């Protein structure tokens, strides 16, 4: 959804994404951002910068110099280096930052799901095999993850995101279903198939 918001608001076909390090979960986040952005604007390009680079220049400044104003940064504020550059934000021409949205994890719901799974009997788990994957990638449909929009978000975009969130929760929209291409043009998921 963060990618969809960025693509809906950007007047350019370039978005920025700042990532910590190339771990499996981080790569999935980057891909999800790009899929969401392409859902709204099929011509958009996501420019990736790694935050842990050795260069002295800030990654936000590198993207800003490329003319990229909408950036998905760190998911949370770092207490050691507080800044306004977190979540999805716009880096304005004068260098100021306008925060737009951020993901929120409901850890209580996550641990509730873990405990429910732990209390299932062996027979129940055996009966679930082949019907339901047992994993810890619970998201919006399990109320573990949400997106909070700031007051800086235009009303039309806010309504679009609420519609998408409600559709995901209701199970009527699956953002990772259907035709998905890799950067090299190869097909990663065919039409009417799911990556879930």
At which residue positions do the language-model features occur?
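Hydrophobic alpha-helical segments within soluble ligand-binding/sensing domains
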Residues: 1-13, 104-125
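An alpha-beta-alpha
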Residues: 2-44, 48, 131-152
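Loop/turn elements at helix/coil->beta-strand transitions in domains of secreted/extracellular proteins
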Residues: 11-15, 41-46, 65-70, 98, ...
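Short beta->alpha junction loops
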Residues: 47-55
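Short, well-structured alpha-helical segments in soluble
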Residues: 55-67
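Periplasmic-binding protein-like
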Residues: 66-77, 100-105, 127
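A structured, mid-to-C-terminal "fold-capping" secondary-structure block
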Residues: 117-184, 188-191
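Conserved small/polar residues in nucleotide/adenosyl-binding loops
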Residues: 193-195
